[in-house]
Amino acid sequence: SEAQERHNKVKARVMADSLVGLIKAASNVIIMGHKESDLDSMGSSLGLKAICDNLNKPASVVFDPKSVESKTKNAITTLFSRDDINRIMVSPHDVMDKLKSNTLVIVTDVHRPSMTLCPKLLEEATKVAVVDHHRRAEEFIESPIFTYIEPSASSASELVSELIRFASVNPKMELPSAYATFMLAGIYLDTNFFRAKTAGMRTFEACMILKEYGADNTQADDFLKDEFEEYALKTKIMSNSSTPYLGVVVSLADPKDIIEGATLAKVANQTLQIKGVNACFVIG
C-alpha cells in the first residue's frame, strides 16, 4: 500500500543515518556475506563498500575464491582487474589481521553466523551490523549494534541501493558503475527477473537508482546466463522428475554429478513456471 511504501522509505532513511554514524565512528570496516557467494551477496557488499569509500573510511570485502558461485566469480573477473580485486577484497584467512578494537563488521544477505564466510570474525568482533532480506532464523548473530532485516525486500542489493540513496548528501554519493551493475545482477537473481512475489515498487525504484549510477542491464543479464554445461545439467535433472501428487513435482539429480545449490534452485524456479505446478522439490 502507499502508506506502507512511505513507512518503508522513512525506515530506510533512519537506517541509512544510523549506519553512516556507525561507519564514521569506526576505525575501519569489514564487509562480509554468506558462503557460496552469489551475485546479491557480493553486489550488496560492494554497495556497502561504496558508502564507506564516500565517507573516506577504509573498508574491505571478505571474498573466498573457494566458496563462490561460478557466475559471481565470472562477474568479478569481468568487471575488475587483479589490482582492483586485491584493493577491494580480503580472504577469510587474512581478514583477522584487519580486525581492531574499533572495527565495524557489516554482515549482508545473511544473519546466521554459521553461514557467513568467516564465523570466527563474528566471534572476535565487538561491533557488528546486519543488513538482510531473509526472515529471521533461530540462529542469529549475537548482540549486533545495528540490525536492518526487511523480509519484504526482494534482495540485499535492493536494501543497500536504498541506503545509498538516503545516505547521499551534497555532493551526491559516488557509486562506481561496475558496483551498480553487480548490484543490479543481484536483484535480477533474487527476483528471478522480477517474477518473485517480493518484487515490488521498491525493487523497481532500486533498479532506477542503480541505472542512474550507470548500471549496465545488458551486462547484468549476461552474468546470469547459463554455461552450456549448466544448461545440460538442468535439463538432465528435469528429465528425472515425477509427480507423486497432483500439482507436486519431485526432481532427482544424479548422485554422481557435482551440482551448485544455485543450479538446483534454478531447476525449481523453472519447474514452478509450468502451468499447474504448485510445489516442487529438487534433490541433489
What is the role of each PLM region?
Residues 1-11:
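Helix-enriched interaction subdomains in cytosolic or periplasmic regions
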Residues 11-37, 41-88, 92-104, 189-284:
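Hydrophobic helix-and-loop "lid/oligomerization" segment in the mid-to-C-terminal part
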Residues 34-35, 65, 108-111, 131-134, ...:
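Fold-independent oxyanion-binding glycine-rich loops
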Residues 42-44, 72-77, 118-119, 140-143, ...:
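Short acidic, glycine/serine/threonine-rich loops at helix termini
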Residues 77-82, 124, 147-149:
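Short, hinge-like loop/turn segments at secondary-structure boundaries
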Residues 88-143:
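Active-site cofactor/cluster-binding pocket
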Residues 106, 129-131, 146-149, 249, ...:
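Hydrophobic/aromatic beta-strand patches that form the interior of the parallel beta-sheet core
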Residues 133-206:
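Short alpha-helices
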